[in-house]
A protein has these predicted regions:
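Short beta-strand to alpha-helix junction loop
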Residues: 1-3, 150-151
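Mid-domain catalytic core of redox enzymes
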Residues: 2-132
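Conserved flavin/dinucleotide-binding core of flavoenzymes
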Residues: 72, 78-247
Length: 247
């Protein structure tokens, strides 16, 4: 834990070496088998012995970049007065704006009064408008560059501007209502999922994620990228497959 893997390789004696860095020190652990679970695009760099065609397959999917922002409001009166809990905002910086789901745990109950605090949850999909010549993978790469070039001040300004535009008429005041903003930048966010508009339809077993996840020696490859699906159930499916490969 808290270590960064930098190399995984099959040894001539049938074992596997995994090299990693922890607390500034390089270490190597030796094992009978290994599951390499991580961002598919990084796997070829961590395991250079992969054949070129498999490296190309692993590099096909491009992670979807996001900014997930939480805004804590001292008073949620202006939002509650609007009477809507979720907004789709095409063309705006945040395409989705919603009140965070209320959480009840033990003796804790969420605020319910009109003037009680409220958390807003906002999603920015960092991809520029398509020119017509770009694939979704091209747009995700451009969006990642855009996302990483933004400062917190840029994100803060866009956040306050959109909230003011949406809820100013119901009394929202950015100067007095906002207690805190937390912006989570996911430069490499969701696993790539194929789109009929941009991707071919491959025969079963020949899609890039299927070719890319083939075991090499005693190393198996997992992560949701190997399922071409971004959610936890896919990561679990990948883990089960990889474990079965090494048993």
């Amino acid at each position: 834990l808290n270590s960064t893997v930098v190399n995984v390789r099959n040894r001539d004696d049938g074992l596997v070496d995994a090299s990693y860095v922890v607390a500034g020190n390089a270490q190597t652990v030796r094992a009978k088998r290994c599951i390499l679970a991580g961002y598919g695009g990084m796997v070829p760099h961590l395991c250079p012995e992969l054949p070129p065609a498999q490296k190309e397959s692993l590099a096909y999917g491009v992670k979807v970049p996001f900014i997930c922002t939480n805004v804590l409001l001292r008073s949620g009166a202006a939002i509650r007065k609007a009477g809507v809990s979720s907004y789709q905002c095409p063309g705006s910086f945040y395409s989705l704006v919603a009140t965070a789901p209320p959480v009840s745990q033990g003796n804790f109950q969420p605020p319910t009064k009109v003037d009680d605090p409220l958390v807003m949850w906002m999603i920015h999909a960092a991809a520029p408008p398509a020119s017509g010549d770009q694939s979704s993978r091209d747009l995700y790469r451009l969006g990642r560059h855009q996302l990483l070039s933004m400062s917190f001040e840029d994100i803060e300004a866009a956040t306050l501007s959109q909230l003011s535009g949406m809820f100013g008429a119901t009394g929202f005041n950015a100067e007095t209502d906002v207690e805190a903003i937390t912006a989570n930048r996911w430069a490499h966010g969701y696993a790539y999922e194929y789109m009929e508009l941009h991707d071919p339809v491959w025969p079963e077993g020949e899609a890039p994620h299927e070719l890319g996840r083939a075991p090499i020696g005693r190393i198996s490859i997992a992560n949701s990228d190997t399922e071409a699906h971004a959610y936890v159930q896919s990561a679990i499916d990948a883990a089960i497959r990889a474990v079965n490969e090494i048993l």
